[in-house]
């Protein structure tokens, strides 16, 4: 392509070491007629051809009789393509690449299946966590509209939460583990309306999820036990600039998610939960740097309700693991991502290291446990040191790294491992 002034032409020049960017002054270009009956002289190509003993033009090709067969979707739903000697949640790993990373690798094993049409994706795995064995199965089918996703996790011990009277005559909840094996299941359907155009990735995605666990909670009035379950309708709007190959975050754009959580089978104990989350992307100080600012607010109805929901829609500040009781909560997160080094280094066919990068972050959360109650603060800061690489010449990029976290209000310095993968 020519420069804006039109006085120089840029083009890709292929050499022995690969492609390189080259340019020529526009006034040096030759305007000559070409005779297509005469082959164009290319010294580099002729040198390579002289080293080869096989000439495709003189090869004798035998005809192949192909017999077409009908492709039956049901028979070809599952096609195992890879496995791992550890466990990780593929869906979680894929969803963290654009906004955050998480510590999701556990001891165990994983197998993954994806059919030829890329409409049926399955993951089955076993993992060991906190002294218990777990079995995990997830399946996504994208051949319909809407997309359907189901997942189940079986392991650990289930518990019951019951009402009891304390020494002061007050009604309080007391939990105890049971002999039941813990079961957690979720079904989700969503409509991926893709409005992408040119360099803007845009879309609207309404969704509804149903969540079930066999942990049981006793209702305050009727004293009946019910398994904890909820319904979560939500809608996602997104519009951001397509990333260049070296970009870590989009240069500009936003994602807006609105959510409403309700427990239709246990309304005596729990009120509805509303949440809104806004993610914005901004250019950094230097090229390929990126700034991500995230804002969130959630509100839980407590009037006439006996318990707080054991579920939050806003993410906790990094470095805090305690689930706070909340009536109202707002959150702010800032991430600044920057590349450190792009070595393009490989060790034979074992590994290929594409890039080393860093992410500086600050998290702040303000929480009010009850109406007219005091507000509490949880905040932290830290950095991520991350490697983007490929292993054994697999086409799936892998992201690994380490996270250093320093809670500000209380808590100790922490170190976490990071993992993510893209398919």
Where are these regions (language model features)?
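Transmembrane beta-strand segments that form the barrel wall of outer-membrane beta-barrel proteins
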Residues: 76-130, 150-156, 172, 210-218, ...
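Residues on the lipid-exposed face of transmembrane beta-strands in outer-membrane beta-barrel proteins
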Residues: 109-113, 137-143, 152, 185-193, ...
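Outer-membrane beta-barrel translocator/channel fold
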Residues: 18, 149-205, 209-223, 293-330, ...
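C-terminal outer-membrane beta-barrel translocator/porin domains of Gram-negative envelope proteins
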Residues: 157, 163-165, 175, 221, ...
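Residue position within the beta-strands of beta-propeller blades
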Residues: 8-12
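Conserved blade-ending motifs and adjacent loop-strand segments that build the rim/top face
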Residues: 1-5, 37-43, 384
